[in-house]
Amino acid sequence: MAVEYNQSTDYYYEENEMNDTHDYSQYEVICIKEEVRKFAKVFLPAFFTIAFIIGLAGNSTVVAIYAYYKKRRTKTDVYILNLAVADLFLLFTLPFWAVNAVHGWVLGKIMCKVTSALYTVNFVSGMQFLACISTDRYWAVTKAPSQSGVGKPCWVICFCVWVAAILLSIPQLVFYTVNHKARCVPIFPYHLGTSMKASIQILEICIGFIIPFLIMAVCYFITAKTLIKMPNIKKSQPLKVLFTVVIVFIVTQLPYNIVKFCQAIDIIYSLITDCDMSKRMDVAIQITESIALFHSCLNPVLYVFMGTSFKNYIMKVAKKYGSWRRQRQNVEEIPFESEDATEPTSTFSI
């Protein structure tokens, strides 16, 4: 997968560069894509900076609270924690791609491979953990709640998700390199046919979008039906959260995967022979994948901050921090009269 606007997942040959999405050596006329590169130099660094700041703040808060304050965790807590970790690692690759868009790849061949693989691992694992959360919410609402806490199966599922994502990143580790134009791009041996390239593209779409989406859609649909039938409970807030989660997933992920699928079809049948159309496809992949990765910034809001208990806990932490600041000021003013006033930490649930 990797960042396709900086390094296409179509696995083009050596003569391709950063934003080229087709090997135009097969055509009589060379397609010059200077406008696409200029757009990338402006759009990508600006968008990545915004995504990095917002995503780092939200996901770091989630990880810190789960790691240091909430010791007793449910299955959903474990999935959300893994999701936040995946989102953080994904966000940490963005500064490298921002520099790559402007100055080219300056960190060498090994870092090109590692950064590309990290992007794929955490993008794919994030989508899978979203599916895990929906499955757990389905079981929590429609079946009898488990009394055993997290349990071994939950950790096995997390392990399998990470392993699957790592396996999907193998093409990045093997084929990504720095070309003669200082771009971190995939360079495949010539004997690998278009069917192999398209197969990898389709596999990424299936694992990174179709499978998680189908799981989420089915689980949340059944969960919503069950909630509606339940008497004497407040239904508006849970249903609103379910609806928001599904809509945000569709809005952020569907456009990118549609463009990605069009690329895969073009790899097989070479449908795009017009230079202007190829440029529009390149810009489309830049914009849609940026929107797709922005989902990592929204996950803390959708899965954590919308929970009343979590918001209450944040308020308690803020009050405790304010009390600590006032105490520090009193210590500086009247050090011999200071006391260590503490407040017990309470747990919360999603």
From Swiss-Prot:
Keywords: Cell membrane, Disulfide bond, Endosome, G-protein coupled receptor, Glycoprotein, Membrane, Phosphoprotein, Receptor, Transducer, Transmembrane, Transmembrane helix
Subunit structure: Forms heteromers with CXCR3. Interacts with ARRB1 and ARRB2.
Assigned protein family: Belongs to the G-protein coupled receptor 1 family. Atypical chemokine receptor subfamily.
All ranges on the Extracellular side of the membrane: 1-41, 100-113, 176-199, 266-283
Alphabetized PROSITE patterns for the sequence: G_PROTEIN_RECEP_F1_1, G_PROTEIN_RECEP_F1_2
Residues with attached carbohydrate: N6, N19
Keyword rRNA-binding: no
Protein purpose: Atypical chemokine receptor that controls chemokine levels and localization via high-affinity chemokine binding that is uncoupled from classic ligand-driven signal transduction cascades, resulting instead in chemokine sequestration, degradation, or transcytosis. Also known as interceptor (internalizing receptor) or chemokine-scavenging receptor or chemokine decoy receptor. Acts as a receptor for chemokines CCL2, CCL8, CCL13, CCL19, CCL21 and CCL25.
Cytoplasmic side: 67-79, 136-153, 223-241, 307-350
GO cellular component terms, A-Z: early endosome; external side of plasma membrane; recycling endosome
Protein's organism: Bos taurus
PTMs per UniProt: The Ser/Thr residues in the C-terminal cytoplasmic tail may be phosphorylated.
Phylogenetic classification of the source organism: Eukaryota, Metazoa, Chordata, Craniata, Vertebrata
Pfam families in the cross-refs: 7tm_1
Subcellular location: Early endosome; Recycling endosome; Cell membrane
Protein name from the UniProt record: Atypical chemokine receptor 4
Gene Ontology MF terms in the entry: C-C chemokine binding; C-C chemokine receptor activity; chemokine receptor activity; scavenger receptor activity
Disulphide-bridged cysteine pairs: C112-C184
